[in-house]
């Protein structure tokens, strides 16, 4: 259903790696085409290596810096930088810096009950050894 989504409408969930505000998900908008999240990674926090078997993803860094892994490649991203991740590609976002990182994340299509599913692979090789 078409609607305005105000900040007070955003449902925020807390994870081991930080917070995610569900700005656009089936439970909020009824849209099953995509999911939009506002993510904050506090200094020293990460969304460790994982993949989305049924979803493509775009991450746009709005503020702060992160070390973004895409497969076994990494790059430091700053405000305005982004990464596109095809479905089933392992990736991870790490805030190795002294300030919070704010990301806007879009996943498509919406999948699962909340619109978002991830498979943690951070304890599997080679991912478990990549960050030392």
Model-derived features with residue positions:
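A short, N-terminal "cap"/entry segment at the start of jelly-roll beta-barrel domains
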Residues: 1-33, 118-132
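Conserved short histidine dyad/triad with adjacent acidic residue
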Residues: 21, 37-52
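Short histidine-centered beta-strand/loop micro-motifs
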Residues: 25-29, 47-52, 94-96, 120
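Short, charged/polar surface micro-motifs in flexible loops or helix N-caps
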Residues: 30-34, 42-45, 65-66, 109-113
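Conserved hydrophobic/aromatic beta-strand scaffold that supports enzyme active sites
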Residues: 36-40, 58, 74, 82-84, ...
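A short beta-strand-loop-beta hairpin characteristic of the jelly-roll/cupin
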Residues: 46, 53-79, 89
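Ligand-binding loop in jelly-roll beta-barrel domains
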Residues: 79, 87-113
């Amino acid at each position: 259903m078409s609607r305005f989504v105000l900040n007070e409408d955003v449902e925020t969930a807390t994870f081991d790696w930080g917070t995610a505000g569900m700005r656009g998900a089936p439970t909020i908008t009824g849209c099953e085409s995509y999911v939009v999240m506002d993510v904050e990674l506090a200094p020293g926090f990460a969304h460790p290596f994982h993949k989305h078997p049924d979803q493509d993803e775009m991450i746009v860094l709005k503020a702060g810096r992160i070390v973004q892994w895409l497969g076994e490649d990494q790059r430091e991203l700053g405000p305005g930088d982004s990464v596109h991740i095809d479905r089933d590609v392992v990736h991870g976002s790490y805030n190795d810096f002294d300030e919070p990182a704010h990301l806007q994340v879009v996943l498509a299509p919406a999948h699962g009950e909340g619109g978002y599913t991830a498979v943690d692979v951070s304890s599997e090789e080679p991912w478990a050894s990549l960050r030392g």
